[in-house]
Amino acid sequence: MKVTLLIPARFGSSRFPGKPLAPINGKPMIQHVYERASLAKGLDAIYVATDDDRIKDAVEAFGGKVVMTSAAAASGTDRINDAIEQLGLSDDDLVINLQGDQPLIDPISIEQIVSLFERHPGEFEMATLGFEITDKSELDDPMHVKMVFDNDFNALYFSRARIPFGRDTNDYPVYKHLGVYAYTKRFVNAFAKLPLGKLEDLEKLEQLRALEYGHKIKVAISAFDSPEVDTPEDIRKCEQRLAVD
């Protein structure tokens, strides 16, 4: 089983145009993501998947690999699907989808999600990461997606609202979703052909499509947070974290 990590990156963003190239401590953000991913063991290849020449040039400037995808890609998964077809991966090869706005991703978290497939072959089609929320300001922030899972760590639901809701207490763990996915090439091909899900459209969370169509998502709980950069203000916070990392 070949393991390929893809970092989808687009230049356009309503909240933060040009986000992948935003400088963080003198390097474009996409370089931080790529270099952190390259520290993970067990990966056969890493590519940035983009439709923008500016991102392509920046990645190649630091020695990274790029696969150019269609500008018509409607979602991150569509971009991933386009990339894996170009790369000629086999149906059973493992694909890691790491968001391009996670410059603080810990390599161990990537290894953790890969090991799920290695330890449980054929038991599920998709896996992702969660982290127990420690910053209470994130509990009711819709930018931080919450998740619940069963006793076997199969995802039950993802929401921008706080889930679960404690009717009689606030003293219970709440987990947020970290935007890292793992799946086989075969599953990505099938997923990309599924119609938009009703819950997916309501919450604007693509992973809900898998649950709506009956697919199992296995969850690994990471010991490391991986906050996403959504606004220019997040850059400053990221630089502070990197200073002590």
Curated annotation (Swiss-Prot):
E.C. code: 2.7.7.90
UniProt keywords, alphabetically: Cytoplasm, Lipopolysaccharide biosynthesis, Nucleotidyltransferase, Transferase
One Pfam family cited in the UniProt record for this chain: CTP_transf_3
GO BP, one annotated term: lipopolysaccharide biosynthetic process
InterPro entries xrefs: Cytidylyl_trans (IPR003329), KdsB (IPR004528), Nucleotide-diphossugar_trans (IPR029044)
Cytoplasm among keywords: yes
Major location (coarse): cytoplasm
Catalyses which reaction(s): 8-amino-3,8-dideoxy-alpha-D-manno-octulosonate + CTP = CMP-8-amino-3,8-dideoxy-alpha-D-manno-oct-2-ulosonate + diphosphate
Transmembrane residue ranges: none
GO MF annotation, one: 3-deoxy-manno-octulosonate cytidylyltransferase activity
Annotated metabolic or biological route of this protein: Bacterial outer membrane biogenesis; lipopolysaccharide biosynthesis
A cellular component annotation (GO) from this entry: cytosol
Localization in the cell: Cytoplasm
Family per similarity comment: Belongs to the KdsB family.
Stored NCBIfam families: kdsB (TIGR00466), PRK05450.1-3 (NF003950), PRK05450.1-5 (NF003952), PRK13368.1 (NF009905)
Family annotation (PANTHER family): 3-DEOXY-MANNO-OCTULOSONATE CYTIDYLYLTRANSFERASE, 3-DEOXY-MANNO-OCTULOSONATE CYTIDYLYLTRANSFERASE, MITOCHONDRIAL
Its biological purpose: Activates KDO8N (a required 8-carbon sugar) for incorporation into bacterial lipopolysaccharide in the Shewanella genus.
Name of this chain's protein: 8-amino-3,8-dideoxy-manno-octulosonate cytidylyltransferase
Species: Shewanella denitrificans (strain OS217 / ATCC BAA-1090 / DSM 15013)
Lineage start: Bacteria, Pseudomonadati, Pseudomonadota, Gammaproteobacteria, Alteromonadales
